[in-house]
Each structure stands twice: as C-alpha cells, then as structure tokens.
C-alpha cells in the first residue's frame, strides 16, 4: 500500500469512534427521557392517590360525625324512654296503692263459719307467748343491690339474734360448705371468696331455708325425713338435731321448689315455714324452741303455696311474697298473724321494686328491720318502713 493510501484512511479511522460515541449518547438520552416520563407518571399517580386518600379521610370523618350525632340522639331517646318508664312505674305504684289487689286468700264462707266455730272452741290454742312487738311492714323504703355472687339461687344473711357483722353465704341449693365474711365490706369486694372463711359442715344442707341465730347455724338436712341441724359456729360442732314432725312434706313455695322448710327469725324467736300433702294448697307455720328444737305450736295458714317465692316473719306475722312464672314484681300479698291482731284481708299490699328475676331466699333481720334477698345471683337489701298493726 502506498503512502498516499494511508493518508486517505486516517480520517476514516478517526471518524469511526466519533460515530459510536454519538450513538451511545443518543441511547443514554432516550433512556433518561423514558426515566423522566416514568417519574412524571409516578408523581401524577402519587398526587392522585393523595387526593383520593384525603377525600376518603374527609368522607370517613363526616360519617363519624354523623354516627356520633346519631348516637347522641339515640342516647337522648333512651334516657327519655327510661324516664317515661320510671314515671309509668310510679304511676302504676300509685294506682296499685289506691286500688290494691285483693289479698291472695281463698274465701269460702262455709269454711270461714267452720273456722269461726272452731276458733271459739279452741281459744286456748292462740299463741300467748308473744312479746309487745306490734309492728308490721308498711312499704319497702329502699333497695340496695350489693353485687352478683355465685349461683342463680342461694342465701345470704347475718346473725338474726346477735350483734355480729359477719355475713354468711350459702351458694346454690345443695352443698356442704358455708362462706363466712368478717364484714359487709369484704363481701362486696370483687374477689370476695379470697376474703371468706369456709366451714365444711358434717352433713350437707338442702334448699335455701337456713338461718343463723344467736351464734348457731340452723340448717335443713334431708336424709329420708327432713332434719333441723343445730350447729355451733364457735366450736364447729353439731349440738343438736331433730326430725321435723311433719309427714309427706312438699316444697313450701310454688316458685322455689328446692326449699321444703324455711327457717325464719323475728322479734319473737325462731319459726319454721313448711307445707304438707295433707294441706297441699296452703302454707303451714310452726314456732320452734331454739334451744331444744321442739315444736311449740303449729298453724295452717290461709296463704296459698301457688306462685309463692319466699316468706319471712315479722313480729309474729307470716309475710308471704308472690310472683309469676315469668318473673315480674314481687309483692307481699298474704299476711298471717298468729296473735290474731292483724286479719289477712286488712294487711297492706307491699310491692318490691322490679329487679332481675325472682327471689330464691328472703331473710328478715329484726335488729336492722331489713330483708336480705337473693335474686338471680344478685344480693339485695330491702329496707322496710314499719308501722303499728292497729294503724293498718
């Protein structure tokens, strides 16, 4: 190759790298342009998503404000309805007071004549050991719900004849254990059972008719015939027992079929409320000697078992509380006074405030003039307004 040909090839060889460099720059520019386009799209999408999120947030806030207003409106309506219901209950109470229902006593003129004739011949059977207590219940002054503890049925009470502040609890309708709380405060605590002493009785108890009286626990045991067990709470021993002298016993309350004997205490002493097949429609009453457990006297009362849920004795007068199969307002609708001072048809009709269900036990405290009740697992105190029997 001649020299002149080499000189011609030199410009061509120098132009080749410049062409490749130009192509590379164009490629880079295209890639950068594509990247910028995608970044612009991302910015557009991000802006759109931010706008949609802001709109959604505003929409949710608006819905929450509307829901809050509706909730306030519903609460106001509920409060108004509750106020109307309370006013209606007060009006019903007033109407019931003005137009009381007839006592829950069957009236049979022939039977009344026979009873009157028999009463003239048997005046010596009128109970004459009563004290000068002449009070009866006028109304329920106040109700206090303590807490919810244990089973739907049970019993709680204080010592009816002592000054002790201890609380005694029978949980359920059949067991062998009694809970003892030192004071009301310990019982009302959330973890109440941790503060309670437990006594395991030598014989299991049945029903909710038991009683603490003068430092002794009187409870019902069923082993063939029913027995009344007298248990010393101080030394934890059985000091006496007695077979209850009634044949073919049946549940004493129609709405509380688990209780066959209801032990009660009042200003006069110890009582037993029961029922038998011989007089299966009505409730019977007996006066007990708390020392020997002997029966001092027995009565066939005019108070029906049907729809009865509980009973207690005040100043020698049996007060029976009635309800319905579908729990409603309990009421003392039959009163039987063993002294004859207060005829059943002249007793006040006493209504209890509406609660949760029905009473499984009602224990009257003569010292405090109040009733300790167990209502569907809730422990309730009813404070009673009293008046003289002659004022009824």
Curated annotation (Swiss-Prot):
GO BP term, example: signal transduction
Record localization: Secreted
PROSITE patterns xrefs: OLF
Domain of life according to the entry: Eukaryota
SMART domains in the record: OLF (SM00284)
Residue runs in coiled coils: 25-99
Signal sequence bounds: 1-21
GO cellular component, one term: extracellular space
InterPro entries: Olfac-like_dom, Olfactomedin-like_domain
Keyword Ribonucleoprotein: no
Residues bearing carbohydrate: 175, 235
Main location: secreted
Domain Olfactomedin-like: 132-388
Keywords (A to Z) from UniProt: Coiled coil, Developmental protein, Disulfide bond, Glycoprotein, Secreted, Signal
Cystine pairs: 133-315
PANTHER family: OLFACTOMEDIN-LIKE PROTEIN 3, OLFACTOMEDIN-RELATED
Main function: Secreted scaffold protein that plays an essential role in dorsoventral patterning during early development. Stabilizes axial formation by restricting chordin (CHRD) activity on the dorsal side. Acts by facilitating the association between the tolloid proteases and their substrate chordin (CHRD), leading to enhance chordin (CHRD) degradation.
Family: Belongs to the OLFML3 family.
Protein name: Olfactomedin-like protein 3
């Amino acid at each position: 190759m001649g020299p002149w040909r080499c000189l011609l090839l030199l410009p061509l060889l120098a132009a080749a790298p410049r062409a490749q460099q130009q192509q590379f720059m164009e490629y880079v520019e295209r890639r950068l342009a594509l990247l910028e386009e995608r970044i612009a799209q991302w910015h557009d999408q991000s802006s759109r998503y931010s706008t949609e999120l802001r709109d959604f947030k505003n929409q949710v806030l608006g819905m929450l404000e509307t829901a809050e207003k509706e909730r306030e409106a519903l609460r106001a309506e509920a409060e108004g309805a509750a106020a109307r219901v309370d006013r209606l209950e007060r009006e019903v109470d007033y109407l019931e007071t003005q137009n009381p229902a007839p006592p829950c006593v069957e009236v049979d003129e022939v039977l009344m004549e026979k009873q009157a004739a028999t009463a003239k011949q048997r005046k010596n059977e009128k109970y004459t050991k009563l004290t000068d207590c002449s009070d009866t219940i006028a109304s329920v002054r106040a109700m206090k719900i303590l807490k919810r503890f244990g089973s739907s049925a049970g019993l709680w009470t204080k010592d009816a004849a002592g000054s002790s502040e201890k609380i005694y609890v029978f949980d359920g309708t059949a067991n062998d254990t009694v809970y003892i709380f030192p004071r009301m405060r310990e019982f009302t605590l959330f973890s109440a059972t941790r503060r309670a002493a437990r006594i395991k009785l030598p014989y299991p108890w049945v029903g909710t008719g038991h009683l603490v009286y003068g430092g002794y626990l009187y409870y019902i045991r069923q082993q063939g015939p029913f027995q009344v067990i007298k248990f010393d709470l101080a030394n934890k021993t059985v000091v006496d027992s007695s077979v209850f002298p009634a044949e073919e016993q049946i549940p004493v309350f129609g709405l509380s079929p688990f209780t066959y004997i209801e032990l009660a205490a009042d200003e006069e002493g110890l009582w037993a409320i029961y029922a038998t097949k011989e007089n299966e429609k009505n409730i019977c009453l007996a006066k007990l000697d708390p020392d020997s457990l002997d029966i001092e006297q027995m009565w066939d009362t005019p108070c029906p078992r049907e729809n009865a849920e509980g009973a207690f004795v005040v100043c020698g007068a049996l007060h029976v509380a009635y309800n319905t199969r579908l729990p409603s307002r309990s009421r003392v609708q039959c009163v039987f006074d063993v002294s004859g001072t207060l005829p059943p048809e002249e007793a006040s009709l006493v209504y209890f405030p509406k609660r949760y269900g029905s009473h499984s036990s009602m224990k009257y405290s003569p010292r405090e003039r109040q009733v300790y009740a167990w209502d569907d697992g809730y422990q309730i105190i009813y404070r009673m307004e009293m008046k003289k029997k002659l004022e009824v």
